[in-house]
Each structure stands twice: as structure tokens, then as C-alpha cells.
Regions:
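Short aromatic-glycine-enriched beta-strand elements
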Residues: 15-19
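Beta-strand/loop nucleic-acid-binding surfaces
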Residues: 25-42
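Phosphate-binding glycine-rich loops and their immediate beta-loop-alpha structural context
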Residues: 86-91, 95-147
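Short, small-residue-biased leader/transition segments that mark boundaries at the very start
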Residues: 2-8
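Walker A/P-loop
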Residues: 186
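Canonical P-loop GTPase G-domain recognition
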Residues: 131-183
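Helix-rich effector regions associated with P-loop NTPase G domains
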Residues: 39-56, 67-86, 92, 121-122, ...
Length: 330
């Protein structure tokens, strides 16, 4: 007997899932077919909607996952073309950077292009604004980005900044927090919820770097509006982009790309490329252009590897069907 209503994945710990239902929380596992018949990226993640079959007061088996929408992915570490699902049914992604040595505008770009790829609204959250930092330098670095996405300066020690961030979350919206370790994602979630719902830790005094507090993705409900998903800090965030050409539309070179002679200009060595002209004349910072080339190369590499992977899977499926047909005709 399947439970008729849809249930949402709140948390995943290895092969165990915590499912939120109208009847409370259930600890669930996957059926064998789901666990071994799917790639890691296809397994349920936080935010996914599923149907499950209860077999105890608070335990059950997940038997079906509904089609996904607005799922944020990243490239799985140590692989060429495998991807990992971070969260599903996401409306906004808070890209959190701290205003200390962690701040890196190139890293912000990396998160931003992946978030936009999935039709999720990016929001830049510059946390720990109570620290002593060069505000003018930061604003100059994010000038182009801030023309495209909202930017918030926040600190848990400055309540008015938390209030402004909370007001940006509409009722019913799901927000995922992404960023490096130690930028204060869990502390921000606690501040937005006005209570301690997630564990937090201090910055290491010896290294000045954050410790991993969140070890898994976890969903929490705000008191009066949205749903927040905290994620572990990441040391690397590999791109999962099908069309590398789309990068030029969201990065800083987009202002110049519109003037290129050819609409399909890739801004590498094409004649009449306005981007290259801007770089050569010094109008466009070479660091910005180099970042575009790096992200494009990475996106192209994944896209090509993914295409080859699908091609092999299609050939294997065809081979299996041929074997089945031969057996059936004996």
C-alpha cells in the first residue's frame, strides 16, 4: 500500500533518508531497484518529493521519486562526468562568502553560473560584515555581479542585516545555502530561524579557517515563511553545464559579447570579437577574461564527457535488448 500524499526528503545520511510527511517524520531506506538501479545523481536528495510505504510507526521504504524540478548539481569530486545532486525544488540559492580571507569573486562567479544553469535565483550573501574589511574594494569586485543579482552584507551580530535578509525570503520559498567551510552558513540559518536549529563551530585560531560543522544537507522550516536547506562547506565546486556557450551570457564579458560580429562567437580567436578587443585595449581586465576561459574549458570538458557517457550507455542498453530478444526467440 502506497501512501497517497507526496512526502519530502528532509535529510539524507548515507543510505538512510528522513522524510517529512503529514503524519510526522519517517526514517526511510530505498528499495533495491532504486538503490542499485540508479546513478548517484539520480538518488533522492534533500528537497525531492517521494512516495513511500510505511512498515513501522516511524519507518518506511521509499518506492518512487517524483520528477525533479530546479535541482542544483555539482560535479562529483574526483570524476570526469559524474554529477551530484545537492538539493531539489530550490527557488533561491544564497551564495555565502565571508568578508575575510575567504572572499573570492571568481568563486562567486563559479557558484552563480551553476545556479543560473538550473533556473534558480542566485543571491550573494557577504557574511561577517562586522569584521574590518575594505568595503570599497569588495564593492568594486562585485560591481558587475551586483548588477545581475541581489547582494546582502550580513552579520549575526548586526540584527538589522539579518532582518533584511529574512525579508528577502517569500512565503513558501525554498532557499539553499552554498559556500565554503567557515563562512557562517549554519549560523545564518539559526539567525533567520531565530533559534538554534543547526550545530555551529568557531573558526580555528591557528589556521583562521572554518571547521566542517554541517556534514550533511539538512532542511529546516522558518517560523513564518520559507524553507532553508543548509549544506556542508565545499572545497571545490565543479561545473555541470550542458552548453558552455551560455557562460558568456552571465559573466562580466556579456557587456562586450553583445557587440561581437558573429552571434555564435565563442570569444576565443574569432574575427570581430568585441570581447578580445576589450581585453587587448585594456578596457576588460584580463583576469576576468581568463576566468571565463577557465570556466568554459571546464564546462566543455564535462559536456563532452557527459555526451560520450550517454553514447556508451545507449550502446550498452541496445546490446542488452538484443541479447533479450535473442533469448526470447529461441
Amino acid at each position: 500500500r502506497l501512501v497517497g500524499s507526496e512526502m519530502c526528503i528532509r535529510d539524507r545520511h548515507r543510505t538512510c533518508y528522513e522524510v517529512v510527511s503529514e503524519n510526522g517524520l519517517f526514517q526511510c531506506e530505498l528499495t533495491g531497484n532504486m538503490m542499485y538501479g540508479k546513478s548517484d545523481a539520480e538518488l533522492p536528495c534533500t528537497g525531492d518529493w517521494v512516495l513511500f510505504q510505511p512498515f513501522d510507526e516511524n519507518k518506511g521504504i521509499i518506492v518512487y521519486m517524483l520528477p525533479r524540478e530546479r535541482t542544483l548539481y555539482r560535479k562529483k569530486s574526483g570524476t570526469v562526468a559524474d554529477k551530484q545532486a545537492i538539493a531539489s525544488y530550490v527557488d533561491k540559492a544564497f551564495i555565502v562568502q565571508s568578508l575575510d580571507d575567504n572572499f573570492n569573486v571568481r568563486r562567486v562567479e563559479r557558484f552563480m553560473v551553476q545556479v543560473l544553469e538550473e533556473n534558480i535565483k542566485p543571491v550573494l550573501v557577504l557574511n561577517k560584515s562586522d569584521l574590518d574589511f575594505d568595503r570599497q574594494s569588495v564593492e568594486e569586485q562585485i560591481n558587475h555581479i551586483s548588477n545581475q543579482i541581489p547582494v546582502f552584507f550580513t552579520s549575526i551580530h548586526q540584527p538589522q542585516t539579518i532582518l533584511r535578509l529574512r525579508e528577502s525570503i517569500s512565503e513558501g520559498e525554498t532557499v539553499v545555502f552554498v559556500g565554503s567551510s567557515g563562512v557562517g552558513k549554519s549560523s545564518l540559518v539559526n539567525a533567520l530561524c531565530e533559534k538554534s536549529v543547526l550545530l555551529t563551530s568557531d573558526i580555528s585560531l591557528s589556521t583562521g579557517k572554518g571547521r566542517h560543522t554541517s556534514t550533511r544537507r539538512e532542511m529546516v522550516l522558518m517560523n513564518d515563511s520559507g524553507v532553508l536547506i543548509d549544506t556542508p562547506g565545499v572545497r571545490e565546486f565543479g561545473l555541470v553545464i550542458d552548453n558552455p556557450d551560455s557562460l558568456a551570457e552571465v559573466l562580466e564579458i556579456s557587456d562586450y559579447a553583445e557587440s561581437c560580429r558573429f552571434k555564435d562567437c565563442k570569444h576565443i580567436n574569432e574575427p570581430g570579437c568585441a570581447v578580445l578587443e576589450a581585453v587587448n585595449s585594456g578596457v576588460l581586465d584580463y583576469k576576468v577574461y581568463a576566468s571565463y576561459l577557465k570556466l568554459r574549458r571546464e564546462a566543455w570538458h564535462f559536456s563532452a564527457s557527459e555526451h560520450e557517457k550517454r553514447k556508451k550507455e545507449k550502446s550498452f542498453t541496445k546490446l542488452v535488448e538484443e541479447v533479450k530478444n535473442r533469448k526470447a526467440n529461441r
